[in-house]
Amino acid sequence: MKKVVFESVGNVLLFVLMGLAFMFPFSPYEGGATADGFSLSVHLSPLMAVFVVFLVLYPIARAVFVRRSGLHASTRDNLELAADDERELQITGRALRTAYRVLMTCLIVGLGVLAAAQFLSATFLGDAVAVYRTAVGIIAATLVAASASYCIRWCLEYRK
């Protein structure tokens, strides 16, 4: 169960950071360094910097977790989908069905919200960035909801 929770929490963090980094890429942090004959200027969103750091650190943390857990070679690639026995295979199937239902529901609702955001933006705001942020937020929220529902269902089924 630890492997599913670890992977799901990592995925949720990844999707949240990715969503925030891509929702607000236009809020740059400007910094610079100069030396004799050398100049460096950085224009980067702080959220994008956190996302990039997470992309570097998460695989390292995952490798350490896999090594310390003593998982088999067959389960290293897909921790949340790996099954050690028939019971875990059935649990994974039920959790995947739940995640699929949540994913489809969120996508249908998200399309409606996106259409409403497009209409409101075109009618009242005239701001294309608001529609972009809404779309990225919907995609990130959908991925978070699917990952969280998979983890919750998997843990509930495992404890039965």
Model-found features: residue ranges?
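Alpha-helical transmembrane segments and their immediate juxtamembrane interface regions
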Residues: 2-10, 24, 121-160
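Membrane-interface elements of multi-pass transporters and channels
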Residues: 28, 32, 67-68, 119-124, ...
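Membrane-water interface at transmembrane helix exits
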Residues: 23-26, 61-65, 113, 153-157
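Alpha-helical transmembrane segments and their membrane-interface junctions
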Residues: 19-23, 45, 98-121
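Short membrane-interface loop/juxtamembrane segments of multi-pass integral membrane proteins
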Residues: 78-96
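Long, highly hydrophobic alpha-helical transmembrane signal-anchor segments
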Residues: 1-57, 130-137
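Membrane-water interface of transmembrane alpha-helices
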Residues: 57-77
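Lipid-exposed faces of alpha-helical membrane segments in multi-pass integral membrane proteins
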Residues: 13, 50-53, 57, 102, ...
